[in-house]
Amino acid sequence: MALRFPRFSQGLAQDPTTRRIWFGIATAHDFESHDDITEERLYQNIFASHFGQLAIIFLWTSGNLFHVAWQGNFESWVQDPLHVRPIAHAIWDPHFGQPAVEAFTRGGALGPVNIAYSGVYQWWYTIGLRTNEDLYTGALFLLFLSVISLLGGWLHLQPKWKPSVSWFKNAESRLNHHLSGLFGVSSLAWTGHLVHVAIPGSRGEYVRWNNFLDVLPHPQGLGPLFTGQWNLYAQNPDSSSHLFGTSQGAGTAILTLLGGFHPQTQSLWLTDMAHHHLAIAFVFLVAGHMYRTNFGIGHSMKDLLEAHIPPGGRLGRGHKGLYDTINNSLHFQLGLALASLGVITSLVAQHMYSLPAYAFIAQDFTTQAALYTHHQYIAGFIMTGAFAHGAIFFIRDYNPEQNEDNVLARMLDHKEAIISHLSWASLFLGFHTLGLYVHNDVMLAFGTPEKQILIEPIFAQWIQSAHGKTSYGFDVLLSSTSGPAFNAGRSIWLPGWLNAVNENSNSLFLTIGPGDFLVHHAIALGLHTTTLILVKGALDARGSKLMPDKKDFGYSFPCDGPGRGGTCDISAWDAFYLAVFWMLNTIGWVTFYWHWKHITLWQGNVSQFNESSTYLMGWLRDYLWLNSSQLINGYNPFGMNSLSVWAWMFLFGHLVWATGFMFLISWRGYWQELIETLAWAHERTPLANLIRWRDKPVALSIVQARLVGLAHFSVGYIFTYAAFLIASTSGKFG
């Protein structure tokens, strides 16, 4: 018999039903479960796939640059960033009638185009790119890197170039190289680019390879570096009247600590950012020399962890045994990496809008909204993945003997306390927040809005004041002119910072009130409930009260029949599955809040958010319904407009989302019956019965149907909100 898919599992390849295809796809990347896998091949496969991942990333970014250079309007956008709409790429659609062609011909283009809401124009402009030729050069370079990555992946699959397991498990060398190489050297290189290309570019000086060695980034060259007069690099910064991209009002400083924003671009000072990256480079270059390798100096990770024992002996054996547990478990390492990356991605969302790094991006409202939402959703998926792999670690890699009485064992020992406390926090937040919203709703409905329960967020306001916001009247820390912190920073970063914090046109420390207090607690409810489900899923992965012996059932078992009192919904996979719904729900609230707050800020009617956000009907009527009106108006009796594509996507998103429920709320028997009926009809129909198939069609398993349902739910949910967000924002602000 010919080799059938999947080749990595002989058992599955011989399955006579359509299960073979679905289970094959589901386990294709679960290298550990493949037939002839060894630990060495497992590590080598993963290592080689990283090169493929890099190749895809480089190809993708190369494509962005190439399409903007070919079909965009970068050069005309550079001339007037605030009024020219950036073009992502052309639209070729033979079905377009004349009204559509007119509606989508924008940004000075000759035919229908898509507008870019990704911020790439602002990014490329800030880092010194100015012409289409620059973009083409970048695209070709990234294409070259993509090819190099593919060659690297191929090379490391050849017998001679396959690294050994001991190389993969050399934690100290990896830490040193990743800290000093990935973070340190790349930050230093980026500082170099900012100082040599971007900062001169912001001052009207065009630095390229042909004049790179002739243009001094600073009038005094490297003199101050070698003589220790580093402060000279901070003298004569750009003035507040500086016009970005020109020499008008420009200074000569390259490394500053001005604080606040460039008045014209509303973004952080480039010289501040160069300084920041230099500092990061220094810290990580030092950190990358801290661990003991061939030279016998520095820390040993194992020694560090073994020494971490809580004093007094009351809290067990601390970190003993952790080194081998983590170093031998790819799932533990992946869980840690995903948790870190998820947090970082969410922080990127928060900081990209509040402290914009790219010139003029703060005035491009749709881009700000799109980037915030994009990064928050990605953070949510990555964080749930962290807990999923944490659970797989407990099932496949956790060894109780190796971890006796250390922090991992103690987490498992008192998991009931952890889960019950999280449960209590979630219940408390949920009932109290909903209670306040519903009370306020009823008061509004009965025409007595003055009877609402409105709570001022005084602690959060106090924290904002401590950072220098004066409008609340708290005389504390940086908002107190007599404090030592205030006086210490007055000569350097503080004037710029205080000016930015107290200027109401940006997103730094937005003024908050009762509506913010309520939605903050609604979000806290979502975060705690999502965490509860994920933590419980991981801590109960090996066994729980009802089913103490889950280890051999694996990560994603569906149900084990009624024998144990019914074991549906208690696998670690089920916890992940439920948590993703809560994660989407939570990020929905987060993005609703962010978007509504900002729309009213940008339109200059903040009172609408303040007054309507304290009760549920306000959210439904004044945010969702009011802002979807443009969307539903994409097609109207007068033809179509440039929002029609979002109107269509809004409908399509709802369709995909609703399709999810078809898989989520149905029984497997119903599907099997349906499939048998369809197969029977097919075989008895002339012409149709000429087409045969080898695999007997069977319904999806419980776990598969849930996965398909979850995928449709997630994609539809995000598609729908993306269309709403982009259309409602671009419809208002162009």
UniProtKB/Swiss-Prot annotation:
Phylloquinone binds at W671. It catalyses: reduced [plastocyanin] + hnu + oxidized [2Fe-2S]-[ferredoxin] = oxidized [plastocyanin] + reduced [2Fe-2S]-[ferredoxin]. [4Fe-4S] cluster binds at C559, C568. Chlorophyll a B3 binds at M662, Y670. Keywords: 4Fe-4S, Chlorophyll, Chloroplast, Chromophore, Electron transport, Iron, Iron-sulfur, Magnesium, Membrane, Metal-binding, Oxidoreductase, Photosynthesis, Photosystem I, Plastid, Thylakoid, Transmembrane, Transmembrane helix, Transport. Pfam families: PsaA_PsaB. The PsaA/B heterodimer binds the P700 chlorophyll special pair and subsequent electron acceptors. PSI consists of a core antenna complex that captures photons, and an electron transfer chain that converts photonic excitation into a charge separation. The eukaryotic PSI reaction center is composed of at least 11 subunits. PsaA and PsaB bind P700, the primary electron donor of photosystem I (PSI), as well as the electron acceptors A0, A1 and FX. PSI is a plastocyanin-ferredoxin oxidoreductase, converting photonic excitation into a charge separation, which transfers an electron from the donor P700 chlorophyll pair to the spectroscopically characterized acceptors A0, A1, FX, FA and FB in turn. Oxidized P700 is reduced on the lumenal side of the thylakoid membrane by plastocyanin. This is Photosystem I P700 chlorophyll a apoprotein A2. The lineage of its organism: Eukaryota, Viridiplantae, Streptophyta, Embryophyta, Tracheophyta. The gene is psaB.
